[in-house]
From Swiss-Prot:
Organism, as annotated: Yersinia enterocolitica serotype O:8 / biotype 1B (strain NCTC 13174 / 8081)
GO function terms (MF aspect): metalloendopeptidase activity; zinc ion binding
Enzyme Commission identifier(s): 3.4.24.-
Pfam families per UniProt: Peptidase_M48 (PF01435)
Chain segments annotated as transmembrane: 4-24, 34-54, 158-178, 193-213
Domain of life of the organism encoding this protein: Bacteria
Protein name, per record: Protease HtpX
Entry note: cofactor: Binds 1 zinc ion per subunit.
């Protein structure tokens, strides 16, 4: 990472704010071509705003503390492990953070492969063996090395563009129809309140439905991150880490970082909206070597 992830929520919020500003100021495109250009600018804008703010938002949301100087043996081990694995993966040393949480979890984020952040919960450090913790860290390092955040941003930008475009196109038609406006250029000169209400509702609804696409991508990348971890530290360590996760309870990152957290349990949504495949499927994929080929 279905519980809408922080990345998706931020995109949705940016899209709605842009839509509100456009509607209130009357800055509305007068043609389909203009609408598409506007949708593209704002659609990708929302995605890249989320990407650029990702480290700050992630640390703020969990109360994470970046390790500047290790204060104990555990922090030294954590820094050494991240440094070693990042060198193996061919990326720059990420920032490393710890956050207070009883559950076993970790996440990676950042705008670039060489400017990333890896954070782990205190629950992970306390309840996992060193081998299992190494596998989880390698999973997050693999997310960074694979460029998953940037790829997610590009996919989200495309999805945002179509959500904004289709929502506002329908809103223009609805506003014109209800006001009796038959502007051949598709102008939104109809009822402005109808245009505003319809476009806001549709952007919200289509944005949630479009998360099916981004969640499919997230699930796909989880298999590859698991495989990346297996290459860095060994298949059995990653399998052991996933098996340990099966015994842990539901993570408490409250829907905010699930798209890139290691723990992907979900009971509230169907698999279409899950950011992670079920743990059993991930274990089976590792055992079969499907993503290691």
């Amino acid at each position: 990472m279905m519980r809408i992830a922080l990345f998706l929520l931020t995109n949705l919020a940016v899209m709605l704010v842009f839509g509100l500003v456009l509607s209130l100021t009357g800055i509305q495109s007068s043609s389909v071509q203009g609408l598409m250009i506007m949708a593209g600018l704002f659609g990708f804008g929302g995605a890249f705003v989320s990407l650029l703010m990702s480290k700050w938002m992630a640390l703020r949301s969990v109360g994470g503390e970046v390790i500047e100087q290790p204060r104990n043996e555990t922090e030294r081990w954590l820094l050494d492990t991240v440094r070693r694995q990042s060198q193996q993966a061919g990326i720059a040393m990420p920032q490393v953070a710890i956050y207070q949480a009883p559950d076993i979890n970790a996440f990676a984020t950042g705008a670039r492969r060489d400017a990333s952040l890896v954070a782990v919960s205190t629950g992970l450090l306390q309840n996992m063996s060193r081998d299992e913790a190494e596998a989880v860290i390698a999973h997050e390092i693999s997310h960074v090395a694979n460029g998953d955040m940037v790829t997610m941003t590009l996919i989200q930008g495309i999805v945002n563009t179509f959500v904004i475009f289709i929502s506002r196109l329908i809103a223009q038609v609805a506003a014109g129809f209800l006001s009796g406006d038959r502007d051949n250029e598709g102008s939104s000169s109809g009822n402005p309140m109808v245009y505003f209400a319809v476009s806001m509702v549709l952007e919200l609804v289509f944005g949630i439905l479009a998360s099916i696409i981004t969640m499919w991508f997230s699930r796909h990348r989880e298999f590859h991150a698991d495989a990346g971890s297996a290459r860095l530290v060994g298949r059995e360590k990653m399998i052991a880490a996933l098996q340990r996760l099966k015994t842990s309870y539901e993570p408490q990152e409250a829907g905010n970082l699930m798209a890139f957290c290691i723990n992907g349990k979900s009971k509230s949504f169907s698999e279409l909206f899950m950011s992670h495949p079920p743990l059993d499927k991930r274990i089976e994929a590792l055992r079969s070597g499907e993503y290691l080929k």
